[in-house]
A protein has these predicted regions:
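Immunoglobulin-superfamily Ig-like beta-sandwich domains in protein ectodomains
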Residues: 478-486, 610-639, 646, 742-749
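Type I single-pass or GPI-anchored cell-surface glycoprotein architecture
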Residues: 546, 551-575, 656-659, 675-757
């Protein structure tokens, strides 16, 4: 099959040939081992910082979801099992308002009798929180497999501290899924609710539904696999299309199981569907059904030089980054692949202009003996299917009921676009393979640094951590991405369910089944206390101000601010800021015993640094330490399993990061013989006398001058350490009273001791 043919098949994902390129590409990207974060902070370490807050109702898992954030009123609304929460986005651990809204006892009993999970199914799990008007929210929950909805009065101003249900519960069917484990996505427009969910108890009837309306309810064509095929709804957004508000469309991001051309195999693919909010259905056909429904496939793949593609087909989360122009809107998607052959995650970004081009392109059509998908070549009726009534292109048509019959018929039979939507540059921003985690959610911030604009990605994982990633452009097939930090934002490991970002507050909000956490977008001091550390971090939020690594502001007034995100070169940015200190580490002395194990500790602050060990013997030139089964370099230092006399010397621990080299440790290893150590350790029980064999005169004659010198040095250092400990921890009680007596007896027996150094 030619390249064009391959693209034709992949555009709809209808070919079993997808498996072959996947297998071929595994070896291509096998070498892309996941990078390490420069800073890793545990939950306990985060709790000690002022930039972290955490909230939970219980130690039990309650499936928290951040469902709506209102930055104008500084409130964030969270749904979980049997509760609705209103949080202060300045500090989520303070002034949190709660509503207890459980499912009725009878519904819980019916749910359990139906065999549903009593813990994760038979409760009222909040899945919809939407602003209804200035004072009220519209909320829906699963209601123990019997969806319920209601209205919450939140007051006009947050200082009123009003938060209570103001109406009786009403049916949530067509507004919220029965099963809380099945996603529900929703958007409220002009007091009309648009939802993507499953409409029945069994979870077989999926629909994009408009409810809560004075007009007729509208939904997708029921049990029509061309429209929806076992969808998993991910998110929904209203996106403008030009200056006319009537042309704006609702986009639903989802993944589906689509049947291939043979009709036997179902492959998972990511799709984006759209409808016009003012669609009221057809007059004779598609009555109370969308007449403007269209969908297209979103591709996130790695294209190799031989033309094969490795696909990440399962969409997990999306984030919309607004720009100055509606068509310049960027859509970030987190994708995974969980096949038995290959497992990984990727982040792809799409331009809204490219999405509009696909929806304005050819429609998909089946023809030929094998019902192969091809581009429709016939006449397309007017107005073009998918066009909104009353918009810039159809000002004379005020309702979809006025559409000609051929338009409605065509829309029913051709809901799929032929061309797929490719990411910017036809490549992912981030790829993770062979990692022990996968990405689940994303939030993005546009940051202005001294050398340009950067997109900082906050990526939630299924391990309960959040990674901060900056992507740097490169000339290769993939951009270079740096994990600036990884944060354990929850005490217990569980997948991140939501991320919400506030650029205004410079805060990130994270939810999982165990609670909600709030963390600052930047912790510049965590990178280190020196200019080189700050520069090597390459964090767009941070810069060296001459004294510390601190928040960067593009004011142009402080020339001493040092920042280099693109290159991260301390040699050019940190001149005059004590770079020599990195080349001249303090020399330490360490003793090893011949034929025993010793460990030279050296751990770079950054896991992104590579370490090399050098040794200098007797003022000779420094040489690289030869590693073997006996001498092993670890993440924490150099392990010598069996010390030889030839191991004695001055060891240098050199770290290299982004081309910048520095000496982290200088350790002088003194090798002691086993006989010497045995002599030092085999004193009699009495502290005032020596055994005959260990008399000082016998010791002096037993060892070489070098060993005697090493012994004196060892004893001197031990005495200095003990003196320091005595100063820090003075003796108390009976031992303190006994010390003068011991000193007196010691002076009387001084002739029996080695002269103190």
């Amino acid at each position: 099959m030619g390249r064009s043919g391959a693209l034709r098949v992949w555009s709809l994902g209808m070919s079993v040939q997808l498996f072959l390129p996947l297998v071929l590409c595994i070896t291509c990207i096998h070498g892309l081992s996941p990078p390490q974060p420069r800073v890793l902070l545990s939950f306990q370490e985060l709790q000690k910082t002022p930039s972290f807050e955490h909230y939970t109702l219980s130690e039990k898992a309650m499936d928290y979801r951040i469902l709506f954030m209102d930055e104008d009123q500084d409130r964030m609304y969270v749904g979980c099992k049997d509760h609705v929460l209103s949080m202060d986005i300045n500090n989520i651990s303070q002034n949190t308002l709660k509503i207890f809204w459980p499912a009725s006892t009878s519904k819980v009993e019916e749910c359990q009798m139906a065999g549903k999970d009593p813990t994760h199914g038979c409760g009222n799990f909040l899945r919809v929180i939407q602003p209804y008007n200035r004072t009220h929210l519209f909320i829906c929950g699963s209601g123990a497999y019997s969806p319920v909805c209601g209205y919450v009065n939140r007051g006009r101003r947050p200082e009123e501290q009003v938060f209570q249900i103001s109406s009786r519960a009403e049916s949530g069917k067509g507004r919220c899924s029965f099963n809380p484990q099945v996603n529900t996505v929703s958007v409220m427009l002009n007091q009309e609710l648009f939802s993507g969910m499953y409409i029945d108890f069994m979870g077989t009837d999926a629909a994009i539904f408009r409810s809560l309306t004075t007009r007729n309810a509208v939904r997708t064509d029921q049990h029509n696999s061309k429209w929806l095929s076992e969808p998993v709804f991910i998110d929904a957004h209203l996106i403008p299309d030009g200056s006319d508000p009537n042309d704006a469309k609702l986009y639903f991001f989802l993944r589906e199981r689509l049947t291939d051309s043979s009709g036997n195999t179902k492959n998972i693919h990511t799709m984006v569907a759209r409808v016009c909010p003012n669609d009221t259905g057809g007059q004779r056909s598609l009555v109370n059904k969308w007449t403007t429904f269209l969908k297209a496939r979103m591709v996130c793949s790695v294209l190799e030089e031989d033309g094969t593609e490795t696909h990440f087909d399962e969409l997990e989360n999306v984030f919309l980054l607004e720009t100055d122009h509606p068509k310049g809107l960027l859509i970030f998607g987190v994708f995974t692949s969980t096949s038995s052959v290959f497992r990984g995650s990727a982040v792809c970004v799409y331009n809204m202009a490219d999405i509009l081009t696909v929806f304005n392109g050819p429609f998909a059509h089946r023809e030929g003996p094998n019902f192969q998908w091809v581009a429709f070549q016939g006449r397309i009726p007017y107005p073009r299917p998918g066009t909104c009534p009353g918009g810039a292109f159809t000002p004379h048509i005020q309702s979809t009921k006025e559409f000609p019959d051929d338009v409605v018929t065509f829309a029913r039979n051709h809901p799929i676009m032929f061309n797929p939507i490719y990411p910017v540059g036809r490549k992912p921003l981030v790829v993770r393979t062979h990692a022990d985690y996968k990405y689940t959610s994303i939030a993005v911030d546009q940051v202005t640094a001294a050398d340009g604009h950067y997109q900082v990605l906050f990526l939630g994982t299924d391990k309960g951590t959040v990674q901060k990633v900056v992507v740097l452009p490169s000339n290769g097939s993939l951009d270079e991405d740096l994990i600036l930090e990884e944060l354990e934002v929850f005490k217990k490991q569980s997948p991140i369910t939501n991320l919400r970002i506030s650029s205004k507050k410079q805060q990130l909000y994270v939810s999982s089944e165990h609670g909600v956490s709030q963390v600052s977008l930047h912790r510049c001091d965590a990178y280190g206390s020196a200019c080189a550390d700050c520069c090597l971090a390459r964090d767009p939020y941070c810069a060296w101000d001459g004294l510390s690594c601190s928040r960067f502001y593009l004011t142009g007034k402080r020339r001493s601010r040092r920042q280099d995100i693109m290159h991260g070169n301390p040699l050019t940015q940190c001149r005059g800021f004590n770079l020599k200190a990195y080349r001249n580490a303090v020399e330490m002395t360490q003793y090893g015993v011949k034929n025993n194990t010793t460990f030279l500790e050296c751990q770079p602050k950054s896991p992104q640094a590579s370490v090399k060990w050098l040794i200098q013997r007797d003022n000779d030139r420094r040489k690289e330490v030869k590693l073997s089964d006996r001498v092993v370099s670890t993440n924490h230092g150099l392990l010598i399993r069996s010390v030889h006399s030839s191991d004695q010397g001055l060891y240098y621990c050199l770290a290299t990061e982004n081309g910048f080299k520095r000496t982290l440790a200088k350790i002088r290893l003194q090798v002691l013989s086993e006989a010497l150590v045995s002599a030092l350790s085999n004193k009699q029980q009495s502290p005032w006398s020596w055994a005959a064999a260990l008399h000082p005169k016998a010791l002096v004659s037993a060892f070489s001058p070098a060993e005697t010198l090493a012994m004196h040095q060892y004893c001197k250092e031990r005495k200095q350490m003990q003196s320091l400990q005595n100063i820090q921890s003075p003796m108390r009680g009976d031992l303190g009273k006994l010390k003068p007596l011991l000193d007196h007896r010691k002076s009387r027996n001084r002739r029996n001791h080695l002269r103190e150094e």
